C-alpha cells in the first residue's frame, strides 16, 4: 500500500527542517492548514483519522510514518492555546500562533471565521535513509 505524503512547510526550507525535526523529537503532534487548501478547491483530500501518511523531510525524502488521530475544522477564532502549543513551535499565546500562520499563509485573507483544519497526529515510526532509499528500522 502506498502512503500519501505528509508535508510540513515547503521542501528545501529551514521551516520544513525545523517542523520535521520537531515531529521526530516528539515535540510536534499537531498541525494547522486552511480548509481551502483541500478538495474541492484543490486535488488534495482532507486527512482521515486513523490513516497513516509518509512524513517527508527537507529534501522530500521519507523520514517517518505518522497517523492522524484527530481532525477538527474550526473557525480561526476557536483555535485554542493547547492546540497552538501542540504544534511544537514554541507558541505561548494563540495570538502568536495566529500571527505566524498568517505570515505562512501569505497573501490569503484570514478572518476570525476562516475555516482552519486542526489535525493531531502521532509518529508511528521513524524511517532511516540507506543509500538514497528509506527503509524501516530493525525491530
Tell what function each PLM region has.
Residues 1-65, 69-139:
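Mixed-charge, low-complexity intrinsically disordered regions
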Amino acid at each position: 500500500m502506498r502512503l500519501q505524503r505528509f508535508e510540513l512547510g515547503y521542501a528545501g526550507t529551514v521551516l520544513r527542517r525545523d517542523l520535521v525535526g520537531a515531529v521526530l523529537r516528539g515535540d510536534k503532534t499537531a498541525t494547522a492548514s486552511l480548509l481551502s487548501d483541500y478538495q474541492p478547491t484543490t486535488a488534495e483530500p482532507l486527512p482521515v483519522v486513523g490513516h497513516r501518511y509518509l512524513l517527508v523531510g527537507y529534501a522530500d525524502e521519507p523520514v517517518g510514518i505518522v497517523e492522524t488521530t484527530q481532525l477538527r475544522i474550526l473557525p480561526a477564532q476557536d483555535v485554542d492555546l493547547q492546540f497552538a502549543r501542540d504544534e511544537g513551535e514554541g507558541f505561548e499565546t494563540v495570538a502568536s500562533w495566529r500571527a505566524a500562520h498568517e505570515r505562512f499563509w501569505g497573501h490569503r485573507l484570514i478572518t476570525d471565521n476562516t475555516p482552519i483544519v486542526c489535525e493531531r497526529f502521532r509518529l508511528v515510526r521513524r524511517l532511516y535513509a540507506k543509500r538514497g532509499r528509506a527503509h524501516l528500522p530493525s525491530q
